[in-house]
Amino acid sequence: MAIFGAIADDFTGATDLAGLLARSGAKVSLRIGVPEGDESDAPFEVVALKIRTAPVSEAVSEALTALDWLRGTGAERFFWKYCSTFDSTAQGNIGPVAEALMAALGAERTVYCPAFPENGRSVFMGNLFVGQQPLAESPMKDHPLTPMRDSNLMRLLAPQVTREVGLVDRLTVARGAEALAEALAQAPAHVVVDAVADADLEVIARAGRDMALMTGGSALAMPLPALYREAGLLDDSAREATVAQVGPGAVVLSGSCSAMTRAQVAAYGGPAFRLDPLVLAAEGHGAASNWLARQDMGKAPIIYATAEPEAVRRAQGELGTGRAGEVVETALAALAVQARDQGARRIVVAGGETSGAVTKALGVSRLDVGREIAPGVPWCGCVSGGQEIALALKSGNFGRESFFADALGMLA
């Protein structure tokens, strides 16, 4: 029976959240899409959806369906997880989904805190920073799907919601959970909360522990297992997060065009094939498939569509933003299945949209969360095509430059 249910707007975000919760030693179950039955054998349930860039009506519908399933598992506290770089424009769905979940749960207010200090994301006076750069001055300003041109979370959120947006700043958070709880009780429906360090997140989580709904990045949920144990909602038993031993074959698939993923692709030393969206649109992925068929999975080849911003803009200009992403996702999803059939048992995927497409193509419905490769990126165990598979789903900007080699080395 679950005590906590989370809805994540993409697959890498779901594994990020599940990995941080699993640090506590509690069992975490990660579902790919909404399951059909209500059975749960874990206190923490995370449902991964693929709605980050979905139209508002579609995103709200899927999130409410996930909420209904999570309530059926016994969960009474819920979390709406989105990216630590917010990744949402004025037409985005973060606010509408939050309002729909609030209405379904009868919640008067909720908090918004995408901060993830361990990965360099912080919120100060309502402004989101990536490292020392305001969000709008960071590489996220050139994100191909959700270019972030404003750093102020209140301004980003206000056009998306129908009720007032407010701020509880770092000065209040620094006074502790009791002071924060008092401030939240007087705040409007949608409350952005500052956090610049993990200690701030613990204060926010403690103040909001009994809220029906909290929203934010994965790091905001990280203190919750300890708080639930403290309140007697979770037992003291702990387990080591592990993934079953799998075969030696491996493949790396990268659809992200983030600055960090570009550096990771450049640093990787395995056999490589680059996908060009314009070629994929005209000719399909036959050339990549033929190349992959000749590869030794023991050498962990990489297939990537990762490119510089100018190349991305050129492809989007000729194909349209949606089509440019679709041809890449379709190709990488098909190539993931081919690689599995050729013996790849460790599959590393970079990019949220790509991870969603690959996971669905592999027919994965549940992931068991294992050890973290980097903060927010765990190895996960699953079954695909009757085979035990280890899957790592990486958000574009996560990990250091050697991430791909680090990941494969961990399960060598």
Where are these regions (language model features)?
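Cap/lid and interdomain-hinge subdomains that line or gate substrate/regulatory clefts
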Residues: 1-5, 31, 43, 59, ...
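Short glycine-rich or small-residue beta-strand-to-loop segments that form or flank ligand, phosphate
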Residues: 3-8, 45-53, 76-87, 194, ...
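Short acidic, glycine/serine/threonine-rich loops at helix termini
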Residues: 17-19, 90-94, 121-129, 179, ...
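Glycine-rich, highly charged phosphate/nucleotide-binding loops
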Residues: 34-35, 55-70, 328-331
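A structural-propensity feature for long, helix-poor, extended segments
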Residues: 40-51, 298-299, 381-412
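Conserved, well-structured core segments that form the ligand-binding/active-site neighborhood
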Residues: 131-290
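C-terminal structural cap/anchor segments
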Residues: 299-350
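Conserved, well-ordered active-site substructure
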Residues: 344, 355-403
